[in-house]
Amino acid sequence: MDIAIVGNGPAGWSCAMTARMRGLSTVVIAPAGAGGWLSGAERIDNYPGLLQVSGKELLERFRQQALALGAEEKSALVRQIMPNGERFLLLAENDVLEAKAVVLCMGAARPVLLPGEEELLGSGVSYCATCDGMFYRGKRVAVLSASTSGVEEAAFLRSLAESVDYYALKPHDVSSLPEGVQAVAEKPRSLAREQGKVALSTDREMHLYDGVFIFRTAVPLRMLLDGLETDGGAIRVDRSMRASLSGVFAAGDVTGGPLQIAKAVGEGNVAAIAAAEYIAKLG
């Protein structure tokens, strides 16, 4: 793949269109049901050329145009991006994708971490069941999830672990949890290291686990891509939408304000052009 675009908002689809017009293979990756605030906007009046269109309709028009041009789409949360020579490896849930350039278009939403979560990441806390599940074979684990995607992950972990407890970070349907996975009606508050295990404190009590797996609809920028420079929670870019790492670009609300659709679309276009120039220089 030439360009992997992370995020399916206006910036992402605009980037995909321009990339395809440049003849580059392109995939747009975002969790199922994503679309940010725009997907819920009842009426948009300030996008040039379209009067009184809903956010959902506008997004679908962007999507259909990009797909008609040959862009691909994949429903998955990108949990980590790793440079690999002149390529990038993207860990997208249970798959690994490779691309020559990456354009980050995830919008402005940022997950709030639990106290102690970042400190224990890689040492008892994981965001990837497929990657780390085998380390907890025959052990006691917990799954903390903000959506139904965690149900599938819990089912996989149940095939390995001795026991799996499931905590909903946000309300969602847990009726399809497999046998052997226990839904716990408590709200996680913090994580810490206790007695050589991960201590999960809730609004009721503390539980000890060998491992804790956390699944959200977004990943903190500092954990998504090591070395990515940010400013006030936004990705720092130049006028060509180049980020601090070679081969990485960003567009839309993820680069900061103003948080406008037209601005996101324009930045997506610029990012695609810059990414195309970068790829051409790779030879």
Across the structure, where does each feature detected by a protein language model lie?
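FAD-binding core/adjacent interface of flavoenzyme oxidoreductases
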Residues: 1-6, 21, 73-138, 199-204, ...
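N-terminal Rossmann-like FAD-binding beta1-loop-alpha1 element of flavoenzymes
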Residues: 2-27
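Residue-level detector of alpha-helix initiation sites
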Residues: 9-10, 33, 148-149, 255-256
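Rossmann-like NAD(P)H-binding beta-loop-alpha module
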Residues: 21, 29, 139-160
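Glycine-rich FAD pyrophosphate-binding loop
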Residues: 21-39, 167-173
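Conserved N-terminal glycine-rich FAD pyrophosphate-binding loop of Rossmann-like flavoproteins
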Residues: 32-55
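A Rossmann-like FAD-binding core segment of flavoenzymes
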Residues: 66-85, 89-91, 97-99, 159-239, ...
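FAD-site-proximal beta/loop scaffold in flavoenzymes
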Residues: 113, 119-135, 215-263, 270-273, ...
